């Protein structure tokens, strides 16, 4: 079983003659897209060994697009959060299918994936604003790679592929962006601005707990214990195809209990009284959702609209514009800077593990080291 190698353009490929099939015809197996002959030889050796061990999987004629849309997306729907499935679907239909969806799944190579990623970096943006570049960011392209790697790994597990071409692909490394947060003075200015706003207590809740947008919008009064000063995060609101749906928290640790400070408890009591007055005023037009954060008629607040309101308040307060999610980062940065143990901050944020907290907010750690050095020295030296 001799392999033949040849360079075509900038890539190497190999082919091997197979035994005659049931139709009596000779068949040929080929693979391409390798950057070096050595890579092609290694891939050939794997195919040769699989053929000898009778473990070779005949390449499927299914296209990449058909596999992702007709098989993979429906199969994983039940095992992932609705918001995640919606995100996957948008990436598949927006980025993958239009560019490499017509390629045969079994013929997909690392080289083709690398070319696909390069194409997205140059001209991948679907909806381009006046000041936006045509290409996607390295971070977004890497998200596409992560999706493809997972989908192709499932294809291998299900017997559609012999190996995962994404294992050897080289997605771009995302640039480390500087985290945008408000300092304590800016946080106070924002809270002063929204203090008289109808949703002022909700903004205060976000600022003093670091809860995610979906967690706050999905919070029910049944999950709030004002007497005990605690709330339980058991569900979240996500936007899927312009519809607000109820989902599980983002991670297992996302299902958690959060202690509230007296000021936030007092603000929520006042807000609940306001909501009850609105219920009486609207009468039969009131919608009893049981939610804490609602519109005046009791209905749920659209997450995108909630973010837009946040931006409006930030502009009105003449504050640096940050995303609503950065309010969560601002809380975490303030808490860590104040010397709150990272484990406690991680638990309040609902991170899957403390390593995520330490990695995300590593910019705060040097100052914490200095504070620790001074405090320990004062304890030991008594000065």
Predicted regions span which residues?
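Short, basic (Lys/Arg/His-rich) helix/loop patches that form interaction surfaces
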Residues: 125-130, 134, 191-200, 209, ...
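Basic, Lys/Arg- and aromatic-enriched nucleic-acid-binding interface segment
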Residues: 126-146, 157-221, 226-227, 238-239, ...
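Short functional hotspots where side chains directly engage DNA or cofactors
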Residues: 104, 166-168, 228-233, 323, ...
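N-terminal DNA-binding module of tyrosine recombinases/phage integrases
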Residues: 8-13, 17-115, 271-292, 296-299, ...
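C-terminal secondary-structure termini that scaffold catalytic or DNA-interacting sites
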Residues: 1, 192, 228, 237-264, ...
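Short amphipathic beta-strand and strand-loop transition segments with alternating hydrophobic
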Residues: 2-7
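N-terminal core-binding DNA-recognition domain of tyrosine site-specific recombinases/integrases
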Residues: 18, 60, 73-165, 176-177, ...
């Amino acid at each position: 079983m001799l392999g033949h190698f040849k360079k075509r353009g900038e890539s190497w490929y190999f082919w091997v003659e197979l035994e005659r099939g049931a139709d009596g015809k000779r068949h040929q197996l080929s693979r391409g897209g390798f950057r070096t002959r050595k890579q092609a030889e290694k891939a050939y050796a794997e195919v040769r060994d699989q053929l000898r061990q009778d473990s070779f999987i005949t390449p499927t004629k299914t296209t990449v697009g058909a596999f992702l849309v007709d098989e993979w997306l429906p199969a994983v729907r039940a095992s992932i959060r609705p918001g995640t499935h919606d995100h996957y679907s948008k990436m598949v239909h927006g980025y993958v299918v239009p560019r490499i969806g017509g390629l045969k799944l079994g013929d997909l190579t690392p080289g083709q994936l690398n070319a696909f990623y390069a194409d997205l970096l140059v001209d991948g943006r679907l909806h381009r604003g006046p000041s936006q570049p045509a290409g996607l960011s390295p971070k977004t392209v890497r998200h596409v790679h992560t999706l493809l790697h997972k989908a192709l790994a499932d294809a291998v597990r299900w017997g559609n592929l012999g190996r995962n071409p994404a294992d050897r692909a080289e997605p771009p490394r995302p640039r480390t962006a500087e985290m945008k947060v408000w300092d304590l003075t800016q946080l106070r200015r924002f809270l002063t601005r929204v203090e008289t706003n109808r949703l002022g207590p909700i903004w205060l809740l976000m600022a003093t707990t670091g809860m995610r947008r979906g967690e706050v919008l999905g919070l029910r009064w049944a999950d709030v214990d004002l007497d005990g000063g605690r709330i339980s995060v058991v569900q979240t609101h996500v936007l899927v195809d312009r519809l607000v749906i109820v989902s599980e928290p983002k991670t297992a640790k996302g299902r958690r209990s959060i202690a509230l400070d007296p000021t936030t408890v007092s603000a929520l009591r006042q807000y609940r009284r306001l909501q009850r007055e609105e219920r009486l005023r609207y009468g039969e037009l009131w919608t009893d959702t049981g939610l804490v954060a609602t519109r005046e008629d009791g209905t749920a607040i659209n997450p995108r609209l909630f973010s837009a309101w946040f931006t409006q308040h930030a502009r009105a307060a003449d504050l640096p514009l940050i995303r609503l999610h950065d309010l969560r980062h601002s809380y975490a940065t303030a808490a860590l800077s104040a010397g709150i143990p990272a484990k406690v901050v991680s638990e309040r944020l609902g991170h899957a593990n403390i390593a995520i907290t330490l990695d995300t907010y590593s910019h705060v750690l040097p100052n914490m080291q200095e504070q620790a050095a001074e405090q320990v020295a004062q304890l030991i030296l008594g000065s």
